[in-house]
Amino acid sequence: MLLPLYHAWACLCFCAALVLGGYVLVMMYGSVGTVRRRRDYEEFEVDVPPGSLGLPVIGETLQFMAAIKSGRGFYDFVESRRLRCGRCFKTNIFGETHVFVSTATSAKMILNNDSGKFTKRYIRSIAQLVGNQSLLCASHQQHRHVRGHLNNFFSTCSLSAFIQQFDVLIVKSLDDWEHRGTVVVLDEALKITFKIMCRMLLSLESGRQLEMLQEDVSIVCKAMLAFPLRLPRTRFQRGIEARERIMSALETLITQRRLARTSHEDCLNYLLSNDDETECKKDPKLTTGEIKDNILTMIIAGHDTTASAITWMVKFLGENETVLDKLRAEQVCFAKKMSGRPFLKLEDIGEMSYASKVVKESLRMASVVPWFPRLVLQDCDIEGYKIKRGWNVNVNAKSVHFDPAVHDNPFEFNPSRFDDESKLPYSFLGFGAGGRTCLGMNMAKAMMLVFLHRLVTTYKWRVLDPDSTLEKWALFSRLKNGCPVLVTRLAEETTDALAD
Ligand code: HEM
């Protein structure tokens, strides 16, 4: 998840390296002919994955940057090499060897990590922003400890308490869409998911405190894509300052909660309530530092991803009338069934069979987190090739999602492909897999389902701009145009007809 960020700031280094690159190239190899011989030699190595390491120093960084700049995203870069070299290939980006794998079997081996040969990449500048006790940066031991506590909170029973709150918030947010006519879905979804995350984590719903937090989180997110230069007014330094403000606001909130001993229905309350329990040597409570770093991590990891996923889902549905009709029929029937009961419950979500497949199919097609980077800790074999310690291996989720050998007609938006429960394991990687599977997976699915239910039973919409260009240098796969749609309220006769 962090590799794209690393590449973002590394691109600045790269520009400087470009100037030096030509010089170094000539100095190191003397002539272009020598460079060619080196590349030819690499291609004939038998036991390492195929693929070119490109030019000395700069590798294939130029091509990588061009793919990202094109707006089609990094997938183009990976896909052209996959077609040429096969499902396991190597390249060199920003001076490091990267191996890309795109089979469900390799995904299983790397993400499950039973051999302990892989670890999530640690990037110092990211750790400075989210905190080194964050799940994204913690050591193996600390990760297990923090994850254990958070897993308990994210269990189904906590989710059940939040469904109604999601629903109230979504109904309120969707209420004024019809008066606006044109709505940019991504902008609206970002507001909704930020509020939901802050409600669920800290019981913050509105007011100046929420606005300030949103501003600061956005500064931290932008800093993740910046060159990590700690000079006054640099983007990175502004991110560090925003982090400090967030930490201090969380510190105040935690102190107030401890002093007042008031109870709230939120994640912070859950983590602090462990304060009262007898100290357990095996699994001690989370420290204030761990709590603060991970609240920030969850806001960052949860709101942008879910908002992007919602946006793609609205686009795919808007462009696939048959699927939308089938979904609307399911949801309108459902709405009639629960008439008299104003808000949704966890059990309702469990009954939304087709809608759940729509969510899954949207995540497959969108591949919001397109690849998962890991660092190789020991030499190993993948797909019959030798992989060296210190290399990066990337599980290329998007290629698995679009592999015709795994998913029939992969470019068709067809939720019914998930009717068959016995699908190849690890063929759907929308939330990752193994010990690093998305912590908020169930929560994200629930948010998407509640949103979907309210949207399709209240509105019809038309996608105004079908452009699928990706936002450049965004944290996740986000639509550049944000998906503008024209919204109109559904006529009552339509919903009545569908329910009959
Ligand atoms: C549709 C929305 C979401 C998508 C597509 C998504 C996707 C992912 C993926 C693919 C990973 C694994 C990355 C890897 O293995 O390298 C991940 C990790 C993570 N996600 Fe999500 N996520 C979503 C929503 C959320 C939400 C709502 C939260 C809120 C808690 C969240 C918190 C996290 C955290 C903390 C991690 C790191 C887990 C760890 O390393 O142990 N995500 N997410």
Give residue ranges: language-model regions.
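Cytochrome P450 proximal C-terminal region
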Residues: 1-24, 49, 82, 170, ...
